């Protein structure tokens, strides 16, 4: 009896893992008949994803912020890809995109909505921000995701499809001030609530949590320019409490971190998105990038004091620090 128990203790995890692998490998049929709408296709993850899905035979509805971005997508696409201009912060633009998508998909419904559009800046010390600095990011990353999802849910319910929301590892660990981390935490919680509410209608919800990748979101020149703008808008009292050396060291730290961990292989993220759209049993969360898997995600389970200490070791100290 004791030998049997020991055998079961070893065999059960192995069997569970094999079952998980089998379920994870199952794919949905007839992808050439499925419509997927992707936001933020001008560059980065969205641009690569729409081209990859188009090559696989999906009917891609690529939503771009600019005409230039839409032209770039069309030049590299096949005959089944369609483009439209979309500003996720503008309700009229969302309504126009909904009417366009409704005509495109017809009675088929929408198989996938990939909420990829996003912005990261301004990002920096919290005290340097104004409310408008938070709002500009939250309108795209949080309110835009919510507005798009609610608008397209009827089409998704008709197609029994799935919502793929792009969050971030910074939706697990708040490492910077500004609206970015706040918005990505919001995407995580919104997606969890939506998944629990909407599964009754056959709609699945997946969260993509990329680590640091070389995209417009992690552009060093833009980050440094925004940090200088924030610094210049500070009152003399606040500026004096930090000291100009703090600004210079803060920029050095950001430059060092981004150069160290940013991955240029965007396909690590788009592969997760593709799995979420093609798997019969998509995962709830996908972590993309080595820094996410061995760094940020494990750190998110650590006590708050561990995270605080880790970040304090990296970030500079203000000139008039009292602790």
Residue map of PLM features:
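The beta1-alpha1 cofactor-binding region of Rossmann-like NAD(H)/NADP(H)-dependent oxidoreductases
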Residues: 86-99, 131
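Substrate-binding pocket helix/loop in short-chain dehydrogenase/reductase
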Residues: 124-126, 133-135
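Residue(s) in the substrate-gating loop at a strand-loop-helix junction
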Residues: 168
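Conserved NAD(P)H cofactor-binding loop of Rossmann-fold oxidoreductase domains
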Residues: 116-122
């Amino acid at each position: 009896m004791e030998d049997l128990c020991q055998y079961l203790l070893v065999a059960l995890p192995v069997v569970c893992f094999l079952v998980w692998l089998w379920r994870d490998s199952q794919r949905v049929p007839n992808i050439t008949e499925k419509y997927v709408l992707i936001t933020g296709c001008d560059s980065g993850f969205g641009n690569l994803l729409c081209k990859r899905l188009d090559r696989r035979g999906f009917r891609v509805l690529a939503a771009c912020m600019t005409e230039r971005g839409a032209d770039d997508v069309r030049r590299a696409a096949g005959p089944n890809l369609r483009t439209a201009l979309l500003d996720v912060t503008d309700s009229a633009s969302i309504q126009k995109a909904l009417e366009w998508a409704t005509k495109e998909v017809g009675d088929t419904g929408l198989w996938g909505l990939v909420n990829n559009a996003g912005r990261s800046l301004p990002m920096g010390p919290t005290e340097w921000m104004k409310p408008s600095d938070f709002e500009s990011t939250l309108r795209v990353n949080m309110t835009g995701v919510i507005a798009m999802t609610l608008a397209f849910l009827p089409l998704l319910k008709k197609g029994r499809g799935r919502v793929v929301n792009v969050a971030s590892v910074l939706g697990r660990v708040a490492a910077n001030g500004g609206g970015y981390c706040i918005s990505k935490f919001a995407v995580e919680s919104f997606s969890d609530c939506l998944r629990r509410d909407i599964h009754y209608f056959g709609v699945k919800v997946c969260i993509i949590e990329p680590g640091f990748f070389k995209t417009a979101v992690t552009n060093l020149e833009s980050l440094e320019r925004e940090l200088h703008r924030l610094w210049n808008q500070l009152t003399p009292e606040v500026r004096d409490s930090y000291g100009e050396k703090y600004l210079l060291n803060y920029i050095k730290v950001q430059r060092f971190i981004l150069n160290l961990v940013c991955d240029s292989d965007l396909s690590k993220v788009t592969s997760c998105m593709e799995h979420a759209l093609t798997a019969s049993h998509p995962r709830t969360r996908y972590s993309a990038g080595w820094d996410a898997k061995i760094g940020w995600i494990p750190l998110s389970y650590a006590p708050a004091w561990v995270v605080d200490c880790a970040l304090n070791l990296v970030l500079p100290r203000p000139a008039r620090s009292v602790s």
